[in-house]
Amino acid sequence: KQPIRIGAQLYLQKFYSSFGFIKDSDMYLEDDIEHIEMILP
């Protein structure tokens, strides 16, 4: 099983965490919107 990696908008962190995703980076800007990398191991 391969881990799934996403670039999520920061305000959706709790939403993705509810599915088991874990924060895997510091915040970064993409198109002036705050994002974080998340991984589902």
What are these regions (language model features)?
Residues 23-25:
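A secondary-structure capping/hinge motif
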